[in-house]
Each structure stands twice: as structure tokens, then as C-alpha cells.
Amino acid sequence: EYGTPEQIQTYLRPMFTTEEIWCQLFSEPGSGSDLASLSTKAVDDGDGFIVNGQKVWTTLGHLAKWGLIVTRTDPDVPKHRGLTFFIVDMESDGVDVRPLRQITGEAEFNEVYFTDVKIPKENILGSLGDGWRVSLAILMNERVAIGGNVRERGSGAPGHLVQLWNDKEL
């Protein structure tokens, strides 16, 4: 819905087929469940954006090739405005992923630090400053997908997704 034709062509199939793992970079230590109060900043440097900040509770961040990060691009407007989503290469210089160890020793969740991470302008997802609308769409789709995942155990849900993809002919 928000991706450009080039983004759809480049990223959607490997994401859909799980050839490439993606993560969502939403939550921040000081924001709790108030996504709009985030403090991770993306500053336009002319060629792209420089991102600085921290995300937490990032599921599979340590395995992800790509991430969807929501940032503040305009600090001078109300908090639900001035947010922008980007596609970020998790292997970029300045991305530091730190696993959060659970009592079991496992670490599906991570803290992710961004220090002067360069993101090209073509990696904006949606429109500059329209990140709140994008976040609502992502979260609503996620909730529908979770609710729709009530399938019989062993029924081959990933195989079903790949079949749906192949039927779309993208």
C-alpha cells in the first residue's frame, strides 16, 4: 500500500517467501506503548537521511537483513506528525544489534542502536512526515495476520503463503 513500485519489486518477494528476514523497529525505551513519542531522529543531509537513536524489543533483529524503522523527521510539529518510515539495511555501518537474553538463555528480542546510519531517500516508505498513517496500516495488517493464523497445526501455513504469492504473479 505504501511501497513504491521499485520497493515492491525489490523487497516484497524475498520478504514474503522468508528468503530475507525483516524486523520492525518501533518501540523505544522511553516511549512505552506511546509510539508517537519516539525520539529516534532522521535528519535530511541532502543525499539521504542520517538516523540516530535506539529501538528495543525488536523481534529477530539479530537475524534480519532489513528493517522497517519509524523515525522523527520533523520535531517542530505535533507528535503524531513529522514521523517517517524507512527501509533500513540492518547490515549498515552504525547499526548495532544487542540481544536481550531471557531467563531461558534465548534471545528473540533485541535492542538496536543507530549511530549516524545513512539511509537513502528512495528508502522512505510512504511519504515524508506520514509515518503515523504507515504505522497504523502496518500494525492493523499485523493484527489481522496474527488473528488469521489460527490454522490447524502442521497445515503448512508458510507453504500456503508461497502459493498465494505465486498466484499473484508479481
Regions found by a protein language model. Give the residues of each.
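A structural signal for short hydrophobic beta-strand segments in well-ordered beta-sheet cores
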Residues: T40-V43
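Short glycine/proline-enriched turns and hinge-like loops at secondary-structure junctions
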Residues: D34-A36, L60-A64, K79-G82, E106, ...
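Short Gly/Pro-enriched turn/cap motifs at secondary-structure boundaries
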Residues: G30-S33, W57-L60, P75-V77, R101-E108
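Glycine-rich beta->alpha junctions and the first turn(s) of the following alpha-helix
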Residues: V95-L170
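Residue-level signal for inorganic ion chemistry
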Residues: T4, F86, F114
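FAD-binding glycine-rich core of flavoenzymes that anchor FAD
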Residues: E1-E28, G46-D47
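A short core secondary-structure module
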Residues: N52-R98
